[in-house]
Amino acid sequence: MTKQPLRIGITCYPTYGGSGVIASELGLQLARIGHEVHFISYDRPFRIPAFQERVYFHKVQVVEYPLFQYPPYSLALTSKMVEVANQAHLDLIHVHYAVPHTSSAYMAKQMLDGNLKIVTTLHGTDITLVGSNPNYMPITRFSLEHSDGITSVSEFLREETLETFGITVPIEVIPNFIDPDIFIKQANPKTRETFAPHGEKIVMHLSNFRPVKRLGDIVDVFALVQKEIPAKLLLVGDGPERYKAEQHIREHGVGEHVKFLGKQEAIVELFSIADVYFLPSETESFGLSALEAMSCQVPVVATSVGGLPEVVVHGETGFLCSVGDVHEMAEAIKLLLRDDRKRQAMGKSARHRAISLFNIHDIVPKYESYYWTLLS
């Protein structure tokens, strides 16, 4: 088969989370290197600009009808996939996050008499939390087994999927990635002074503030750090646990040292002023925000769970601690904040690891090669 540009459909959640970020950046990079990319979702993914050459967005319209307690998004998505596949002559549809995208893609393929390849990328909670729920497991397993290709963002997630679902189809590990030309440390003395006017150290956390991120631990750990080291905590993002976290902050009496920044576009500017990035999650299938921090020369203190040990090297690019051990995590952060030389050395090692192993210019060609293998 002549390797001419492909016409690729991409379906993802358009929200503020790792799967949507990776799907968006993958599509944009595929377009930059010559492929035609069609995003199909209920809203424009937040990193997709209004216009970029060879990038198109197709909005899924969900019908509201009194008979439906819950609007049937998966059916509307299937119909839109078929419509776009026919009109744009798609070679394949690449869905990110299995539930419900993979089952919608399977139905679309059947409606197209099998003339459409399906690639499913597993990102984490689609398998570990949602897909493994008894209500969704049968359809998730069936849809995965009928995908033409499956990729996973970490070796941990690959093993977890095989064990949980008992499927026999091969799963290719293609890790998440960063663009090292974008995620690069910037000199921002004015921004730093805004948040730390008296030279305080800065600890940063970025997430969707869901229970799995353990915001309570973040506050507990920061309170322990703040007792000994003048520091500020920047909490970037938003989500269901914010109110509890605010209460917890008041209980500890550290409110004047904590800033909730909400959802931010200028992430690199914030990473660039951070001294430590903190990710004490219950589980992480990869930990994209940790990788982004590392690329900006920020050492990471995280939990030794899921795919995080595949990203963060303990004692070299940061520290990995036990889930819920607030004293261990506090000691790791204090060690980094007190020792400028160690912190800077770990930051440089973190940057080197990020650009050596998780570079967009190395990872996207792996997806490209994977597509060609399936199509041939």
Please state what every model-predicted region is:
Residues H314-G315, F319-V326, L335-D340:
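Conserved acidic donor-binding segment of nucleotide-sugar-dependent glycosyltransferases
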Residues C12-Y16, L28-Y73:
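N-terminal strand-loop element at the rim of the active site
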Residues F156, F177:
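Carbohydrate-associated surface elements
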Residues P299-A302, V312:
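Short hydrophobic beta-strand element within catalytic cores of glycosyltransferases
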Residues I184-P197:
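A short helix/loop element that forms part of the nucleotide-sugar donor recognition site in Leloir-type
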Residues E246-G262:
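Nucleotide-activated donor-binding/catalytic signature segment of Leloir-type glycosyltransferases, i.e.
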Residues A196-F222:
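Conserved donor-binding/catalytic core segment of Leloir-type glycosyltransferases
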Residues K263, E282:
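Aromatic "clamp/platform" in nucleotide-sugar-dependent glycosyltransferases that forms part
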